[in-house]
Amino acid sequence: MKLAQLKKSSKLNNVCYDIRGPVLAHAKKMEEEGHRIIKLNIGNPAAFGFEAPEEIVQDVIRNMSKASGYTDSKGLFEPRKSIMHYTQEKNIPNVDVDDVIIGNGVSELIVMSMQALLDNDDEVLIPMPDYPLWTAAVTLAGGRPRHYLCDEVSNWYPDLKDIESKITEQNKSDCCKLIQINPTRCF
């Protein structure tokens, strides 16, 4: 019996993930030419001095013997509690430990949240420059990304007129879907 050839979903037609695609290929070429490349594309924060809080490290050690099975679907309680405490230190109101969900990295959580929040043809306003996974996740969830400008000359703050020009009936709602994650951390 001959197996049917698998073909990729049309959902991938407009998905480009530059972190592992053309930008990475160009960076490798530059590296081969002798350029020094700092690799920030895969998300290994430890390589750049960002370490897990000691409370989380100790909780992982303490729970290692329980790690052979599934955890609570929201993640281990202790790290969720630590995250809740962090939000309290930052004066972020009304965050309870049950509001915190931990995943296997930001990629999983971005895709999961877009699938949970978007209906087909919902438009999502995304800052430009952006973390490419936002655009890919919106597209895979059936939404349509609309990029608004964050200009270096303006200290990377969003261009409010550009945002206003991008508001349409597809993204105008009681809760406008606006992604404010910005690699420049100006927010």
Language-model segments: residues:
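N-terminal small-domain helix-loop-helix segment of the aminotransferase-like
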Residues: 2-3, 13-105, 112
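Active-site phosphate-binding strand-loop segment of PLP-dependent enzymes
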Residues: 146, 151-187
